[in-house]
Amino acid sequence: MILSDEKCDFLESIASFLGPKDVELVFVDSKEMQEINLEQRKQDKTTDVLSFPLENIDESLPLGSVVINVDLAKEKAKELGHSYEEEISLLFIHAMLHLLGFDHENDNGEMREKEKELIEYFNLPKSLIVRTLG
């Protein structure tokens, strides 16, 4: 189940498919995202999505938190010619894979391949990352 103040029913099927644990979902603007990115990652710039896994000390705790930049999601959706909800779904999949332990910076393409499989399964448009894979 997704824990969020925003209505995001369209993401529930993705969250349920990827696991039984709850996930906190937060929507922010570009300025807020830049502040979070600076505080958490020492990067003084905005970004589209961040994920923060929680230590699995207690099974009742959520898997972690996903923070999505709505400003960049709207821009990217317009640029790539798909809906805002589709872009949010693409970002959510990417972040969920990070929460599940995938890391595209250190693996041999496993995360990208899993992301591609999920995008196809949920009949979403290809993300920019998947488009660059060929």
UniProtKB/Swiss-Prot annotation:
Family per similarity comment: Belongs to the endoribonuclease YbeY family.
Co-factor note (free text): Binds 1 zinc ion.
Entry GO CC: cytoplasm
Annotated localization: Cytoplasm
Gene designation per UniProt: ybeY
EC number: 3.1.-.-
InterPro entries the record matches: MetalPrtase_cat_dom_sf_prd, YbeY, YbeY_CS
Requisite cofactors: Zn(2+)
GO molecular function: metalloendopeptidase activity; RNA endonuclease activity; zinc ion binding
Organism: Campylobacter jejuni subsp. jejuni serotype O:23/36 (strain 81-176)
Annotated protein name in UniProt: Endoribonuclease YbeY
